[in-house]
Amino acid sequence: MAISTGLFLLLGLLGQPWAGAAADSQAVVCEGTACYTAHWGKLSAAEAQHRCNENGGNLATVKSEEEARHVQQALTQLLKTKAPLEAKMGKFWIGLQREKGNCTYHDLPMRGFSWVGGGEDTAYSNWYKASKSSCIFKRCVSLILDLSLTPHPSHLPKWHESPCGTPEAPGNSIEGFLCKFNFKGMCRPLALGGPGRVTYTTPFQATTSSLEAVPFASVANVACGDEAKSETHYFLCNEKTPGIFHWGSSGPLCVSPKFGCSFNNGGCQQDCFEGGDGSFRCGCRPGFRLLDDLVTCASRNPCSSNPCTGGGMCHSVPLSENYTCRCPSGYQLDSSQVHCVDIDECQDSPCAQDCVNTLGSFHCECWVGYQPSGPKEEACEDVDECAAANSPCAQGCINTDGSFYCSCKEGYIVSGEDSTQCEDIDECSDARGNPCDSLCFNTDGSFRCGCPPGWELAPNGVFCSRGTVFSELPARPPQKEDNDDRKESTMPPTEMPSSPSGSKDVSNRAQTTGLFVQSDIPTASVPLEIEIPSEVSDVWFELGTYLPTTSGHSKPTHEDSVSAHSDTDGQNLLLFYILGTVVAISLLLVLALGILIYHKRRAKKEEIKEKKPQNAADSYSWVPERAESQAPENQYSPTPGTDC
């Protein structure tokens, strides 16, 4: 049989090993439009990918359960080459990796990993255990299986992630890797009508005699007869018409009149018919037709072989051998026109906020604080958190787009870790000063002012003025049944000075004793429950209702409204105190100035006196005359009783 020059050149190329081609043993499985090879070798993931690239492939993908079975078949063949093996777990690299910095997404099937050969994520996964959540290092995936057991179709190899390894340390339990090679089509294996042997050499340097499908551009070496008298023929798998691949041969190979149809059905795919002279021919069953190779049968219905993949449906063209593929909703045909791929609807931005693409469909998601709306839930509307029966805020709640915030009544501030609680403001401890003239008592959301004995609370509820001192406290009037009034009249614990300006502290804190504080001058006083300490039993308190303003100071309530001249009396009293203080300070300054002038003059006189010159006479003094006249008398007077 003649062979073209191009075929000889191809054979020459195939006869030379490719640079870097794997010299290790391997197993090959071809199906559909791809071939899978399994290899022994303790390599890092990067080295394994390089070995696959050298022959035009990539580390294998496992995008479906069907593809997982093809990979398992390759591993089964590979394990037979070294049987028996010891019982241990072995790992084989596949083309699933996660780059450094890409974190794990446990809610997705792929968990943030992607295929090195490209392609979209798929819904299929078969993880051995939970993935590491660390994003610091690159991670790679291998198939893990017990090397001593024959892989079972119901137990597909699990995915195991680990560090990608280095040439010096390829990884723990790494035994090999799997490659995948894609082709535009496949040829059927050559069928022999008599004794002989067929050896296939693939474009990725695999040599085997057992392939269920032979990839495009492979060469078949056919040796007919026994080894001593063998006849060799070479055939090339090529594409006759778009989508149709064959070897370019006609009739069965290695036919022998001695065997006829009894040997391998004469090499025919379906029926074999023998002639009277020892010859035979191939035929097809009803509904099929014999192809040009005179061996293979093809259905007259082009859709009988289900050429459409990816969920596509085949539709034959009437009175023709042609067909078309149609995809389900959410899918479209790729460039081959026979495979359906998912449509990414999110590229058209159909959602108001976030869009999540799924296989054959998509769904919209809303941000926190929003909820889906619209007929297809493609829109998002704000969630009114404040409208709920259980408002998240202790007091006021203000809704905003996608969120909310809490507010508090006057006299309170927002508090809590989530800023939903309200805490009372202690106006009496304000760093800017006491809002009262004398005593200050904090209450929930407000405060009250009081005065020491002999003083009365001014109508404005802040200042204290001289008033009538009562010798005993009147009894407390009956309590009102209104809970709000009762709450206002209760005095919280506080420290109370016994005089205006806080000159003396009272250490005892206010307790509920049932006392009623009042004055004979109309004030804003209200019933108040406080404790009068035993050591200061003569202390008298005059308290008035007082509410804080936004500036931190206070203003009287409507109960404290009085005439304008009453406020003026309090102000005049304060002015009197201020003027008296100024006069006293001025007198002290005048006195200090006079003392200073006196001391300066005295010092100046002493300085002049020290500088005055002295004469010699200043060191002598005159003897009194009386002393001179008496000296002779005292010196020479005779002694009584003597003659002198």
UniProtKB/Swiss-Prot annotation:
Signal sequence interval, chain numbering: 1-22
Residue positions where Phosphoserine is found in the record: S619
Stored Gene3D superfamilies: Laminin (2.10.25.10), Mannose-Binding Protein A, subunit A (3.10.100.10)
InterPro entries registered for this protein in UniProt: C-type_lectin-like, C-type_lectin-like/link_sf, C-type_lectin_domain, cEGF, CTDL_fold, EGF-like_Ca-bd_dom, EGF-like_dom, EGF-type_Asp/Asn_hydroxyl_site
Transmembrane segments: 573-593
Compositionally skewed regions (Polar residues) per UniProt: 631-644
Inactivation phenotype: Homozygous CD93-deficient mice are viable and fertile under specific pathogen-free conditions. However, they are defective in the clearance of apoptotic cells in vivo. In addition, CD93 deficiency results in metastatic dissemination by impairing the vessel integrity in a VEGFR2-dependent manner. In the postischemic brain tissue, CD93 deficiency leads to increased inflammatory cell infiltration.
Compositionally biased intervals (Basic and acidic residues): 478-489
Molecular function as annotated in GO: calcium ion binding; carbohydrate binding; complement component C1q complex binding; signaling receptor activity
Extracellular topological segments: 23-572
Subunit record text: Homodimer. Interacts with C1QBP; the association may represent a cell surface C1q receptor. Interacts with surfactant protein A/SFTPA1. Interacts with multimerin-2/MMRN2. Interacts with DAG1; this interaction plays an important role in endothelial cell migration. Interacts with CBL. Interacts with IGFBP7. Interacts with VEGFR2.
Residue numbers of Phosphotyrosine PTMs: Y620, Y636
Entry-linked PANTHER family: C-TYPE LECTIN DOMAIN FAMILY 14 MEMBER A PRECURSOR-RELATED (PTHR14789:SF8), CHONDROLECTIN VARIANT CHODLFDELTAE (PTHR14789)
Role according to the record: Cell surface receptor that plays a role in various physiological processes including inflammation, phagocytosis, and cell adhesion. Plays a role in phagocytosis and enhances the uptake of apoptotic cells and immune complexes by acting as a receptor for defense collagens including surfactant protein A/SFTPA1, C1q, and mannose-binding lectin (MBL2). Plays a role in the regulation of endothelial cell function and adhesion by activating angiogenesis.
Subcellular location: Cell membrane
Species per Swiss-Prot/TrEMBL record: Mus musculus (Mouse)
Domain C-type lectin as annotated: residue spans: 31-173
Disordered: annotated span: 473-508, 605-644
PTM summary: N- and O-glycosylated.
Membrane topology: Single-pass type I membrane protein
Known glycosylation sites: N102, N322
Keywords, ordered alphabetically: Cell adhesion, Cell membrane, Disulfide bond, EGF-like domain, Glycoprotein, Lectin, Membrane, Phosphoprotein, Receptor, Repeat, Signal, Transmembrane, Transmembrane helix
Feature: compositional bias, Low complexity: 490-501
Name this protein carries in UniProt: Complement component C1q receptor
